[in-house]
Each structure stands twice: as structure tokens, then as C-alpha cells.
């Protein structure tokens, strides 16, 4: 029956890990990152769930004759923000998958 004690202990550890992971995922929604482009002329703010919260475009970058440049800067800032979210999620959630071979999880 010794194996049952180990199994119960393992189940308790798994339940605790699931609870801790859910808490960490909940905390991510309250964290924000800012991606920038064009020397911070365009900024995009995203939360830890990859929701875009804000887009800031400085007035001096607005040129009605070059809308494509603004589009490129917004795209670059958005990609920068999303990359930072991925890094944030990896640092926050990586401890749960450390030592496990689960590619692409976090």
C-alpha cells in the first residue's frame, strides 16, 4: 500500500500546481507591457493575455501624405508588445513546466 501514499501525494502536488497556475494566469491579465517603434513615436500597450489596451501615436509622426509609415510603425509596435507578452508569460509560467518536455506550452 506504500505506492498509494505516493500516488495521493503526487495528486495533491498536481492539484496545488493547477491552482498555482490558475492564479498566475489570472495575475497576467493585470500586467501590462509596452511595445514601441520609431524611437517611441508609436507605442502599443498590451496585457498579459495579449489584449491590446492602448495605441499611442505622437502627433509629430502623423503625416497625411505617408499613412503607410504610420501603419508600419503601429504594426512594429504591436509585434514588439506581443513579443514582450510572450516573454512575460514565459517568465511567469515557465516555472510550472520546468523540467517537463512540453514544447510550445508557454
Curated annotation (Swiss-Prot):
One Pfam family recorded for the sequence: YbaB_DNA_bd
Protein name: Nucleoid-associated protein Exig_0019
Keyword annotations: Cytoplasm, DNA-binding
Annotated compartments: Cytoplasm, Nucleoid
Subunit field text: Homodimer.
GO MF entry, a single one: DNA binding
Family under the similarity heading: Belongs to the YbaB/EbfC family.
Entry's transmembrane regions: none
